[in-house]
């Protein structure tokens, strides 16, 4: 079921227009949520994902990018967005290894349901990384990809916030 949903939602996401305005609105919502936190992992956007990199501009916060190796995510400190490498799954990350304790993780998604579960790309990286972590978990999707479909499985991790360009949903 997830494989077919992923395909349908990716097609839908690829056809979304006015991305720049939507991305800007998403960033405004995220900035309000992360205001009191200092160590935040964000995702370098691929394909048609929302681009939230503008939240790092002029910020005094510490940002990190996920480095995906084999089956795991390793947070890497982001010192300079112009000095990146590609990880094992060909996504941009940082070279700088760190043991810093993250406070917030902002994850991408193909889609998200209103039960606060994300539909990722099928690798389980974020589910394994976030398992048993006491951390603020934010998933970012365009509003068109927020669904009522109950697709989560027992190993899926639920998120604390869903951020779209139209609203912020907080899990109670």
What are these regions (language model features)?
Residues 28, 40, 63, 79, ...:
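Short, flexible coil/linker segments at or flanking structured domains
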Residues 1-96, 100:
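N-terminal active-site beta-alpha-beta segment that forms phosphate/nucleotide-binding
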Residues 9, 42, 63, 106, ...:
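A residue-level signal for conserved active-site and pocket-lining positions in enzyme catalytic cores
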Residues 50, 82, 93-95, 123, ...:
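Solvent-exposed, flexible loop/coil residues
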Residues 71-77, 117-119, 168:
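Short, well-ordered strand-loop elements centered on a beta-strand within folded domains, enriched
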Residues 57, 120-126:
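Charged helix-capping and loop-helix junction motifs
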Residues 2-4, 14-15, 100-105, 114-117, ...:
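Surface-exposed, charge/polar-rich loops and edge strands
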